[in-house]
Amino acid sequence: MSEQRKESLQNNPNLSKKDIKIVEKILSKNDIKAAEMKERYLKEGLYVLNFMSSPGSGKTTMLENLADFKDFKFCVVEGDLQTNRDADRLRKKGVSAHQITTGEACHLEASMIEGAFDLLKDEGALEKSDFLIIENVGNLVCPSSYNLGAAMNIVLLSVPEGDDKVLKYPTMFMCADAVIISKADMIEVFNFRVSQVKEDMQKLKPEAPIFLMSSKDPKSLEDFKNFLLEKKRENYQSTHSF
């Protein structure tokens, strides 16, 4: 667990000392499992991406469209509180996907990924894939606290959410190895200021690239796909400390 995370917990007025110790224990246990999973990803030759965002930002639609590229082979772990709908959508596109329903939990944990990983391996999905994509539970808060051992953490911000979210949810955007502004075809409708997002990211994490993406603009997705392929070739590994 990072020093920043410890300090944040200790300064939380809603947590007692006992609560802080419990949370620290949970996060430390998750970090250990995340490190174990990272070793397993590398052993399988998988480049793992952790996609995080609010609900409805377009994560699943983006994955459906990525499935159309023949040079981008991937399988998926889906996280939602309830239903198998997102995994079912991806299976219809020919993507091997395992759904994790978390009940009331607003995030995925490394131990949850382990179970899904084993099932995908048993199905033979891992050996057919270059990437394992984790579509985290839709939430701009909780997932940013849990390391999943991914090579890259990618945050989507959809235009209808507004251009002020980066500094409102700094812990999430500090995780980002890349940021996608999704539903970019609606920028004018919502008076969305891309410049505001760029300015805020410069303050928070200037090295993270920002992509404008729209399902109506196939090239925007292709550019992002090529970026991911290049990062895999480089074997880029996130240095973010959860």
Swiss-Prot record:
Protein name as it appears in the record: Hydrogenase/urease maturation factor HypB
Residues bound to Ni(2+) are 106-107, 142
Q: Which UniProt keywords apply?
A: GTP-binding, Hydrolase, Metal-binding, Nickel, Nucleotide-binding, Zinc
Which residues does the annotated region (G-domain) include?
Answer: 48-211
What job does this protein perform? Involved in the maturation of [NiFe] hydrogenases. Required for nickel insertion into the metal center of the hydrogenase. Exhibits a low intrinsic GTPase activity, which is essential for nickel insertion.
Which residues hold Zn(2+)?
106, 142
User: Pfam families annotated for this entry?
Assistant: cobW
From which organism does this entry originate?
Answer: Helicobacter pylori (strain J99 / ATCC 700824) (Campylobacter pylori J99)
The family annotation for this protein states: Belongs to the SIMIBI class G3E GTPase family. HypB/HupM subfamily.
Show the coiled coil region(s): none
Keyword hit for Transit peptide: no
NCBIfam families to which the protein is assigned, alphabetical: hypB
Gene name tied to this protein:
hypB
Output the SUPFAM superfamilies linked to this UniProt entry: P-loop containing nucleoside triphosphate hydrolases
> A GO molecular-function term, please?
GTPase activity
Q: Name one GO biological process term.
A: protein maturation
